[in-house]
Amino acid sequence: MKWTILNTLICPQSGIAFSAISSLRFLKFIMWYEADVILLPGESMKLYSSRVLINDQYHSLKIYNITVYDEAQWEKLRERPSCPYQAGGKQSDSCFFQSFCAIKRCPNNIPRGEPWR
């Protein structure tokens, strides 16, 4: 089944991401996962038994939980300390998590060890 990414929240301390996903049948879920990629809004994916096809490339994805989408739960996740990416951060903003960020691929494409200015 094909899923579309609606939104993604990232926890820099744990490296776990939370994505709101939707199917063609308008089913909506919140997926908690860890991966070598961050699912960005508008991207699509197809789940298979051992891997995930994301934008026509296979990736490993460790899924911790999938729950039915609930707006109140999503808002609670948004209130947690999170990556500046969620707040629409720009390169001129500062990233307080850079020194200990556990995210494998920065959604702002900042190389490891390079301070965010």
From Swiss-Prot:
A GO biological process held by the record: cellular response to starvation
InterPro entries, A to Z: Anti-adapter_IraM (IPR014448), PmrD_sf (IPR038679)
Location within or outside the cell: Cytoplasm
Keyword Nuclease part of the UniProt annotation: no
Keyword annotations: Cytoplasm, Stress response
One GO term describing the cellular component: cytoplasm
Function: Involved in the stabilization of the sigma stress factor RpoS.
Stated family: Belongs to the IraM/RssC family.
Protein name per Swiss-Prot or TrEMBL: Anti-adapter protein IraM
Originating species: Klebsiella pneumoniae (strain 342)
Lineage: Bacteria, Pseudomonadati, Pseudomonadota, Gammaproteobacteria, Enterobacterales
Gene of this entry: iraM
